[in-house]
């Protein structure tokens, strides 16, 4: 069998694609691990994060922490984990299940010096001042700090004490070097095995007595703890000792739990805010109801009455009525192609692509096929589905372009394939340079960039062309009415129908429909918390679709009645302007985090812009098609001589 170059290239690209797809979907409740008594287990370390900087780092980038004796081994990570800055690695924090409870162990070995110099102490002090939290994993469960909400994962790297007259910068910083680990387990009496159903850490600070000529020979037992139970300060002041003796120690205790293995994630998603979600949904449903009544009045009462009038016998009374109604008077211009038709068709294609990605992801999430245990699975699913939805982008972009009487559909296809992905990739690449300069774990390695580019040009672009090809072969739908050769002049508009004002007014209601849920999403995103209430989010998405469609229909009808036939772009921008409010809110939300660093602000501005751009394409496309079907319906229902 002869294999040509095209088959080899396709096989390579398909392998890259499958490598990122593998594992993002799972069936809840599968693949538990049964621990036997005495079985050795190990904790895996991940990243450290801060809500005040938004710049994650690898755990082993912390100065003074002990690396594993066997060397650092990275877990295989999916695309979403890499983009989110997760770097899961092995550690020497081990345990023998149910047999070593309460025993204090030392991590430091002969190769891991307990002496931390002044320069490294300054780094630790900075991390504690910025309230960095440490993220670990055990049996796929993220660690949570004892006494904290489970939705707020990780444990404190250290803490500060503020004396009177001190600021955060001058406060004493203490390092949490001793960890009290609690493993919750559910026993299976039939085979004397157990499953881990919970993982907590209570971090404390211990100033151990200095051991001279350290050789790592303390054994497993912790050395003597100071009689006054002093805490380990990492704050370095002039005239004081410029180094610290730091031992990393831990102890494990085991607690039986009635929680079943397939319910162990429930505690991470418990929320006291369900009433807020329901209030938001009910409030949005009231808006939808009001808009639905308005649309019904327009279609049933006004339009049907007008259509019956126009299709009746042409009397002088009818002619007078026709002159009073504006939307029929612009029938010769209403299907005139808009300005910049290619740009609008590209926006529509991108909007359909984002809509498809969002809807399919939400369906999988609601059905439970996106695993919370698979870190980065949701982000990977979004990227993969965005790539696969490129075919819809090509099809609908070309379809709209041919409706606009466009001829160069191949050029339109190229713009569709490169515009939205290119903007996102360009912003991401620019931000990544700063993250790489900061040595953050969120900096994407070259290999991942190569994979993204391969997926873009090897899968997404061909799918766009494939969709465009199918669309170009379909006949162009005929307009219900003929377009005049000379454009009709638009009369002066009343103040509230000013294009800029009406567009800005139209975006308020779609934004209002998602406002509350947006707050929870941003809190989850920037506070490194869990967000998994996709049932509420799916309802909000449906409300957003209906709201965007109905507000666009209402505003479009008012525009046509005002004899303004430039409705193509306005139908897209009316609902799409909600993204402006989203961007303003997202940027202002950052002030709540108290961030002042340039890179952190750049991250917020860039990611808020990407999110708002996608939201504009999504809502704008919904508004466009709603108005398009309305206009075709009403003008195909009347007879024009």
Curated annotation (Swiss-Prot):
It is found in: Membrane. Keywords: Membrane, Receptor, Signal, Transmembrane, Transmembrane helix. Its main location: membrane. It is a multi-pass membrane protein. One of its GO terms (biological process) is cell-substrate adhesion. The chain crosses the membrane at residues 280-300, 350-370, 375-395, 414-434, 446-466, 503-523, 533-553, 579-599, 609-629. Residues 1-23 form the signal peptide. Residues 301-349, 396-413, 467-502, 554-578, 630-641 are cytoplasmic. It holds the Pfam family EMP70. GO terms for cellular component: early phagosome; membrane; plasma membrane. One of its GO terms (molecular function) is transmembrane signaling receptor activity. InterPro entries: EMP70, MFS_trans_sf. The keyword Signal applies. It comes from the Eukaryota. Residues 24-279, 371-374, 435-445, 524-532, 600-608 are extracellular. Involved in adhesion, phagocytosis of hydrophilic particles and intracellular killing of bacteria. Associates with proteins harboring glycine-rich transmembrane domains and ensures their efficient localization to the cell surface. Belongs to the nonaspanin (TM9SF) (TC 9.A.2) family. This is Putative phagocytic receptor 1a. The gene is phg1a.
